A protein has these predicted regions:
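Alpha-helix-loop-beta-strand connector modules within alpha/beta enzyme cores
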Residues: 1-3, 45-64, 87, 121-139
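Active-site beta->alpha loop and helix N-cap motifs at the rims of alpha/beta catalytic domains
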Residues: 1-59
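Conserved, mostly hydrophobic/aromatic
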Residues: 4, 67, 155
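Active-site-proximal beta-alpha loop/turn segments in soluble metabolic enzymes
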Residues: 7-9, 33-42, 64-80, 101-117
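Catalytic cores of alpha/beta
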Residues: 10-22, 75-85, 146-158
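Glycine-enriched alpha-helix->loop->beta-strand junction motifs that scaffold or abut catalytic
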Residues: 26-29, 99-100, 133-137, 154-163
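Catalytic beta/alpha-barrel core
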Residues: 29-36, 116-120, 138-144, 164-167
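Flexible, acidic glycine-rich loops studded with aromatic residues
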Residues: 138-146, 150-255
Length: 255
């Protein structure tokens, strides 16, 4: 069980991220340390990565870590990734080094509305995979949503180990719910999504939430599934349809 994006400023409020990180380390198998949302320089980011590794091991000596960040937070071409890894590992003892299992690498993924607008960088992919092998880490790319299946297969063929896909599956679930809502329920769901504000980071400045209703809902519907107001309008009996849709997409990717 992996917790993505632990660290400073990763929640709804700006904070140092320590309290939630230490709780996560007690209950997850792997926790992603990502200080880059707050600390943009390699120097600051590696220092806080080391700091969080040591704090995590104090509360759970068996915890494992994922390090690095995604392109949407900070662009990390191979030369910067190499510098980050070198400085991080030079600051750790052997036990601390062994706690790192995953490395986030980048090859051109970026989400905007319901699309992946990233430009594939094969050189970045190959060189970053080499770095992951050099340090004995499992590589992972974030924001793999909405990519063409053949491109995902191509990345795997080059040596990509794992890829994060989440909003794409959430959108599948959202569409199934939307198609089964009454008109009144759609209005309530849209209002819930609008008020959440979770759509704002995924759209351009000229996006009009009043006219692009379905786009807004598709972008952030999955963020409000745990809201009590959603529970009041949630359609029943759709679990099998949702599971089938998600399973078919996963099977397509893994072929």
């Amino acid at each position: 069980l992996v917790r993505d994006h632990g660290g400073p400023n990763q929640g709804y409020i700006r904070d140092d991220g320590v309290e939630s990180f230490l709780i996560d380390c007690q209950y997850f198998d792997v926790v992603h340390i990502d200080p880059f949302k707050r600390f943009k320089s390699i120097k600051d980011a590696f220092r806080h990565t080391v700091k969080f590794i040591r704090m995590g091991l104090q509360v759970n000596p068996n915890i494992k870590f994922e390090i690095g960040t995604e392109e949407a937070i900070k662009s990390m071409p191979p030369e910067k990734l190499s510098s980050f890894l070198n400085q991080t590992y030079n600051s750790l003892n052997e036990t601390e080094k062994d706690s790192i299992k995953y490395l986030v690498i980048q090859s051109g993924t970026a989400l905007r509305e319901n699309m992946n607008i990233g430009l594939y960088k094969e050189v970045w992919l190959n060189e970053s995979i080499y770095l992951s092998r050099k340090y004995g880490l499992i590589n992972k790319e974030h924001n793999g949503d909405y990519l063409k299946t053949d491109l995902i297969h191509k990345k795997f063929d080059h040596g990509l180990d794992t890829i994060n896909i989440a909003p794409e599956f959430g959108q599948m679930q959202t569409r199934i719910y939307w198609n089964n809502f009454t008109s009144k329920e759609r209005s309530k769901f849209y209002k819930l999504c609008l008020d959440s504000g979770r759509w704002k980071k995924w759209v351009d400045e000229d996006f009009d939430p009043d006219t692009e209703v379905e786009t807004l809902v598709n972008i952030c519907g999955h963020y409000v599934f745990s809201h009590l107001k959603f529970e009041m309008i949630k359609p029943e009996g759709l679990e099998q349809e949702i599971n089938t849709a998600v399973s078919e997409r996963i099977s397509e990717i893994l072929r």
